[in-house]
Amino acid sequence: MSSSNIILSPKRGAERTGARERLLDAAAALIIERESIEISLAEIAAKSGLNSALVKYYFGSKTGLLVALLQRDAARALAEMEELLSMNIAAAQKMRLHLRGIMTTYRRSPYLNRLLHAMLHGPDEPVRREVHRLLVQPVFNCQRKILAEGMARGEFRPVDHGIFYLSAIGACDQFMQTEGVLMLSHTGADLDLFRDQYITHVVDMVVASLAPTAGR
């Protein structure tokens, strides 16, 4: 009997889904604790309480697990992005919500930014291409559509999509570095308040740069 003809019982299917999620959750927790993606299969197994062989069973390798983790935690953000594009609101407001959404996603999953960059700059070209397809290209396309809409309506000055992407994402990426800077320069500061202020500042700054008079 082929694997495609095997029907799992609801209980068995739930067990498999639960094990897969436990492995992903364990990897995420370890990356946050270590502030590094240098985690071993043995450590993931110990954290999850499962056998390390299950990593290969579900994901093929540790890299496969990390890509799956990226995909899982970015899925919600990408769905929200599609919903944003369909909204009947001003392009400037769409861009505000988009940029705030990126930094909110980083805040919700603090390992996501670190993992994304590690995968994009890693030695495995197929992995780099897959991560680019899953995460980078959708964000680039979203920004391109919002920019085109804003320029067509006269809300935005003409800007290069690629340059905008690099500058806007760079500012959003820096959001993940604020904790270390703040701890060194402002002992006892309210980290959550600082992050809220940073998000608002970046959104205001980037959207203001798109105004028709900004480039004059």
Describe each PLM feature range.
Residues 1-8, 104, 108, 137-153, ...:
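C-terminal peripheral helix-coil segments that are non-catalytic and often amphipathic
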Residues 33-37, 88, 109, 153:
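Short coil/turn segments at alpha/beta junctions that flank glycine-rich nucleotide-binding fingerprints
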Residues 68, 82-114, 162-168, 196-199, ...:
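Hydrophobic alpha-helical connector segments
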Residues 117-148:
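A contiguous binding-surface segment within folded domains or other stable secondary-structure elements
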